[in-house]
Each structure stands twice: as structure tokens, then as C-alpha cells.
Amino acid sequence: MGEKTRTASQDARSRQPPDPNSPRVPHGRLDARLPRQQPEVVCPRRRLAVASNRRSPNDAAMDSKVTVAVRCRPLMPREERAGAEAVVVLEDRRVAVGDPVELAARGSSPILGRNFAFDLVLGGDSQAEVHETLGVPLLRHAWRGLNASIFAYGQTGSGKTYSMTGGDGESRGIIPRVCEGLWDAADAHSQTHETTVEASYMEVYNERVRDLLVPTGRPLKVREHPTKGACVPELTVVRVRGRNELAELLAVGSDARATAATRGNARSSRSHAVVSLVVSRRRRSGSSEGITEEGWWSDLDAPGSCTSTIRLVDLAGSERVAVTGTDGARLQEAKAINKSLAALCDVVSALAANSRKKKAFV
């Protein structure tokens, strides 16, 4: 099944107005449209997560097939004014959750409260540090011809979109930084390799797939391809000619994404969004080894020609309807979000079972 390939200029001419029945955010640059942090419902003296004791990097964790990292955002001013308290302490690769009084008395004791272990724990890390920890290893895998993905998962208002997309300048998230790093490497290898990038951007809204680059309002069908697996044949795929063009495509897609205000989040993503980048590298005829500058790619023994796919997924946040108080259209969205996240949990569990050589269907 073929995919529809367009240039960005063709895409801009044929783009139709977004579905008026879907909530939207105003158009603007991708790196300037989201707040630094997303608000969350706060009750007086509510216990929320805050980071202390930053973990030491664990490079080996990123060498496995699946790496699970947790990032805890700090309390926001609104939460502090409401009397929220920190109940989470980060220690190396462990997250401890306990009573605030015990936290204050015992500090970062690893035996405090309930403990959860992860491959990586991120607390007060900057956006740049998060990218170095998660984004750069993804780029290194993709540059060697391996497919790589990042999923941002968590409850509504926990900061997923901030981590993935971010804001302006130093607050840029993983998606824009991965795109920049990709073009940095392509430019550095331009004398020896020809690099092509094809981009697509889609969302799953109310269990329906929609194209975010050419939003028509009608759902797209998911098909099973004999070699590609599950795919969306009608999804727009754009061959990108430069980093600025890619940034503009991301801005167009983010503008079309379903977003609305809820009691739990002033700008809540009401859909799961997937950015896909197909990266193809081919050695130029008669070229010799060598790059024009150093970077994250410098020590890689990458193949001369290869193709890989990068998928960057910003999942909608799980919601407790009794807390967020959603109704009407927002309630239907919340039901669809929670249902799809439960299905994703089943898929992950089945994959984990398969890795332990148990029979499970995915």
C-alpha cells in the first residue's frame, strides 16, 4: 500500500480549514504556543510530586530495547498557593512516595514510603538535559539504521506536552530538539552522504485517526501491510527540504491538533499525537569518509546506506472524571482517551510477556 507523498508547498496550497467541531488552539510557531507547565486540579493540602536529589546519568540504560524513564515536575505556583505538599523523593533510579511529614524528617531515605524503580529518573533536569538523556540516544540508534520511538505517558497536567514539545528557546522539548539534531547530522555529512527526511503527523481523536498536515475532518483507515505492518495509506507524507520547513510542518500539525480547556488542565491535549520521521541515508558516489564537524554522531560506526523511522508520540493524559469534572464532549473525549490508554497497557503487557517467552497475542 503506497503512501501519499507531497511537498510542503503543495501541502500549504491544498490545506483545508480544520474541523469546526473539534477544539483548536490559535496558529503560531510550534515552539511558542505551549505554556512552560500545565496546570492541574489542586485541592488544599493536596500531595503532589516534586523532585529533589537529581539522579546520576545511566548510559547503559539506553542500550536496552525498551527504557522506562520517569520525569517529575515541580509544584507550580498555583499548587503552592493552594497548600499542596511534596510527597515524592527521587534517589538514583528510585522514586519514593511517602507522607510529607516523614519526607521532611527523613529526607531521601530509600526505605521511605512506597518505592518504584525505573531505568532513568529525571527531576529538576532542564529540557536540554532531558534531550541529552533521551533524545540523543534515539538519534544515535536511528543514525545507525534502527527504528526508535519515544512515548510520553502520564496523567493530565503532568507535563507530557511540555517535555515533548516545550516552549521557546531553552524550553524547547524533545521533538524540536530531535529535529534540529537530525539536520545537524545531515549537514555535517552532506559531502559524503545524501540524507532525505519524510515527515507525517497524525492524531488519534475519539478513537479515529486524523491527518494533521492536511486536516480534512474525515477519519483515515488503518490497514495491515504485509511488510510495514499497521499503516495509514491515506496519511500525508511530506519530503522535507530543510530544518525550517520541518519546523513549519510541525507548527501546522500542532495547530490542527484537538486541544481544549478542562478543570484539570488549561490546555489539555484531547488526542494522541504521532510525529513520524523516515530518515534515509545514501553514500554519494565517489565520496570518501569524513564529516565537516563534530557532534553526537562523531563516534558512531554507521552504515553507508540505511533507512530508519523515528516516532515521537505525545499521548493524551489519563483522567479521573470525578476529579476533572468533565461533561458533554469533554467527557466523551476522556472516555476514549482512557480506553485507548488501557489498550496500550494491554499491548505493553503482551510484549513484556513475549519477551519472557510466554505466549501472548498483541
Positions of PLM-derived features:
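Charged/polar low-complexity intrinsically disordered segments
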Residues: 3-6, 10, 40
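Intrinsically disordered/low-complexity terminal segments and short unstructured peptides
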Residues: 4-6, 160, 291
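Intrinsic-disorder-associated, low-complexity terminal segments enriched in Asp/Asn/His/Tyr and depleted
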Residues: 11, 19-21, 53
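Compositionally biased, low-complexity intrinsically disordered regions
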Residues: 14, 20, 36-37
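P-loop NTPase "switch/coupling" elements that transmit nucleotide state to mechanical/effector output
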Residues: 24, 28, 34-38, 43-47, ...
